[in-house]
From Swiss-Prot:
Name this protein carries in UniProt: Venom allergen 2
Compartments reported by the entry: Secreted
Disulfide bonds: 34-57, 81-94, 101-122
Keyword Disulfide bond: yes
Length: 138
């Protein structure tokens, strides 16, 4: 019985890791595709993970900003934190930053695209991109 429980736990753990790796591959592919298709302006950083336009493109492909409701954007942003960051402390920091940025940047009369760009810029200024798995595997 103990062996069965252990095998079941290991199988569940392997499925979680596989799903996370699959999601990361998709996000990496989205970032690479966005980097290829978006023009780089002269004043933009060389690091693609420091570019707001690349993150906006990749997150838009994942549907993070499809719904203009701030609560939905916050929920989807927090889910994205768990997909692109593995360290639990950094995940919690990412969630706090995402919540703060969504709350701040969704105030006032701006287009949904501008709100999304502002949210990403806020998160990048807070250093979230440096804690992602993507930053470690450039």
């Amino acid at each position: 019985m103990k062996s069965f429980v252990l095998a079941t736990c290991l199988l569940g753990f392997a499925q979680i890791i596989y799903a996370d790796n699959k999601e990361l591959k998709i996000i990496r592919k989205d970032v690479a595709e966005c980097l290829r298709t978006l023009p780089k302006c002269g004043n933009q950083p060389d690091d693609p993970l420091a570019r707001v336009d690349v993150w906006h493109c990749a997150m838009a492909k994942r549907g993070v900003y499809d719904n203009p409701d701030p609560a939905v954007i916050k929920e989807r942003s927090m889910k994205m934190c768990t997909k692109i960051i593995t360290d639990p402390a950094n995940v919690e920091n990412c969630k706090k930053v995402a919540s703060r940025c969504v709350d701040r940047e969704t105030q006032g009369p701006k287009s949904n695209r501008q709100k999304a760009v502002n949210i990403i810029g806020c998160a990048l200024r807070a250093g979230v991109a440096e804690t992602t798995v993507l930053a470690r595997k450039k």
